[in-house]
């Protein structure tokens, strides 16, 4: 029985035909979508991951939906297309497909300000503030804001994600919120998956109370610890694929797997790593395929861009994560979304340049099988967990990885954080006139008219407004990490557009807080 492998509750006898079970449809949250060519590109930094819930293990009787809603059927279609993109016409067709606008909802618009208290969850939940005190803000995104909240009866801390009803523009948006809660309820108690404590609704918002994770993000923990080997990477990969296998076996597809959506519960060395943010997740029927383009550019599967995909797309995303864990860089890279998508569709997988010569052949074999462009030939989550490199008794070496991997991981994480910090601080502190002036400053710096400036130029441009940006956030912002190459570039038009969008979100949040304080 040498090749028998057991993981959690399932053994290694998986096939494509019996892997996926359970109900229905689709989840929401204005997924990251590339824009049409005649519109300003939308920056990746404002994806839904900004709404991360820094989510601590706790238990209790969750106050959830009493009855399961029967989700509406999503348009599904023919079997999975396994063809590689090999000609220019096919590639352009796929890119155009990914760049298409989201279809307009064919339903009546709701007057969200007038929604009754039970209109979303369809059950009386009581008011959040009867049971919890709200604390500091943890993060925000297009649909909601996450706060620390403290349970009045126990003093336990949780994370509370509040979704204003005015952002639920139609019946489908309301269904999506119900389904996100239902999916978290469906996964309740599963290891390495964030737990939901309860759901509440008032006349202004829907509130999801979840466990609070204070141990930080996946990449930050790796860099902080300093000691990093293939065996450690294999252990982390096993946790990630264990989450995927658990979700798939319960008929759920995550659809937004990436390092930012995995958080440690606490700072302990053996802290559990948990998957968070199921806002784009969906229930799945056997053989069901989906057509909406969702996810994050570096981690998106080619069949998602082709608008015909199933749970195999989660395996691709997890494969990209393992590639980054072992090399510190993304396998398919570009300076714009379109360049990234081109690489995802037909770029060559690099497993030969540094640091790959020092990585084991077993690890590279697994990555090739997970980043197989034909989803029919791609490994399932169960098969990945049975691969020799990832098993507990497997062959992942315990020798340290090349030091460049850690430095690349640090840069990979720090660059994204720099952009997000700059966006948030600028949007909070600069007037519209100053933001316009900042754009003109970048245009002056950009003598080659490339539309891009280096991080050093970005820093210098921001320093002109230092009188308005005089706080601890800006001090941190101006201390660009040494691991972030100052000659790397950022698209300043994307940067400015993201600032404008973030200002709108912040103004809306202020209005929501005012409205919520006057209503119970």
Curated annotation (Swiss-Prot):
Residues 396-426 are annotated as: Autoinhibitory domain. The active site is at 256 (proton acceptor). A lipid is attached at residue 2 (N-myristoyl glycine). Residues 31-87 are annotated as: Disordered. One of its GO terms (cellular component) is membrane. Pfam families: Pkinase (PF00069). Residues 132-390 form the Protein kinase domain. It catalyses: L-seryl-[protein] + ATP = O-phospho-L-seryl-[protein] + ADP + H(+); L-threonyl-[protein] + ATP = O-phospho-L-threonyl-[protein] + ADP + H(+). Ca(2+) 1 binds at residues 446, 450, 452, 457. The modification Phosphoserine is found at residue 296. ATP binds at residues 138-146, 161. InterPro entries: CDPK_Ser/Thr_kinases, EF-hand-dom_pair, EF_hand_dom, Kinase-like_dom_sf, Prot_kinase_dom, Protein_kinase_ATP_BS, Ser/Thr_kinase_AS. CDD domains: EFh (cd00051), STKc_CAMK (cd05117). It is found in: Membrane. Keywords: ATP-binding, Calcium, Kinase, Lipoprotein, Membrane, Metal-binding, Myristate, Nucleotide-binding, Phosphoprotein, Repeat, Serine/threonine-protein kinase, Transferase. Activated by calcium. Autophosphorylation may play an important role in the regulation of the kinase activity. Residues 433-468, 469-505 form the EF-hand domain. Residues 47-72 have a biased composition (Basic and acidic residues). There are 3 contiguous domains conserved in the CDPK subfamily: a kinase domain, an autoinhibitory (junction) domain and a calmodulin-like domain. The autoinhibitory domain (396-426) inactivates kinase activity under calcium-free conditions. May play a role in signal transduction pathways that involve calcium as a second messenger. This is Calcium-dependent protein kinase 25.
